Amino acid sequence: MPQSASLLSRLSGRRSAPAAPALRKDAASFKGTLIAQGLTKAYKGRTVVNSVSLGVRAGEAVGLLGPNGAGKTTCFYMVTGLVPVDKGTIEIDGFDVSSMPMYRRARLGVGYLPQEASIFRGLTVENNIRAVLEVVEKSRKERDKNLDALLDEFHIAHLRKAPAISLSGGERRRLEIARALASRPNYMLLDEPFAGVDPIAVSDIQQLVRHLTKRGIGVLITDHNVRETLGLIDRAYIIHAGEILKHGSAADIVADPDVRRLYLGEGFTL
């Protein structure tokens, strides 16, 4: 990732939101990038993530994969803001968000879809989306317009009056993504998007992610379903023992002997 690598080298030393005015001088260099550099995390003296750097560009899907206990979930949660960073920086469009809580990152355009069902169970499908629109859009006319557009875009208009709790796994994911887009994010962080989804709905989730990238949204995915994820992403980072083992396209990942030996297995095929 040559361009992102050059950006990473320029981000060193920037630590806090008050530096924003200086960042605006070269904001164009960082626009459309989410870049983490040197992420490190330790628990009780044991380092679980060691100087991990990664990047996501607008309009691409990037996987963050690795075996259980490798540190990928901790790394992912540092990017979302769920886990504080011990060392390293996270920048969104050139703004340092390393010490910001999740809700402030959301204001800068980062959406997050957790593994667990996050629908408002007591609301209808349309009111799940409307609840977010009422926060971000003052005009009722615009709220109604955006609501109809999202229901149509994700093919759930026929379910608008249905209780959200009655949806299937695939329908629920479509609603959750539609609701996340109501806040107009530039990046989406997807935690185990294939978890709890019937096999028949896997292709539906893959199409939803492709739809996000076509919208120009950068997507970072972590998932244990490696075959489904590699069949979807533009690039992937493989984490092993808290460090980046390999970065590249799905073909590069599958062909790498160390990745096959330590993670995928010798018989793995896409």
Task: Please give the residue ranges for each predicted region.
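Conserved ABC ATPase "signature" region
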Residues: 95, 130, 141-159, 206-210
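Catalytic Walker B motif of ABC-type/P-loop ATPase nucleotide-binding domains
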Residues: 188-192
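ABC ATPase NBD coupling module
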Residues: 96-116, 140-144, 214, 253-258
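Conserved ABC ATPase signature
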Residues: 163-167, 171
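The feature captures the beta-strand-to-loop junction immediately N-terminal to the Walker
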Residues: 65-67
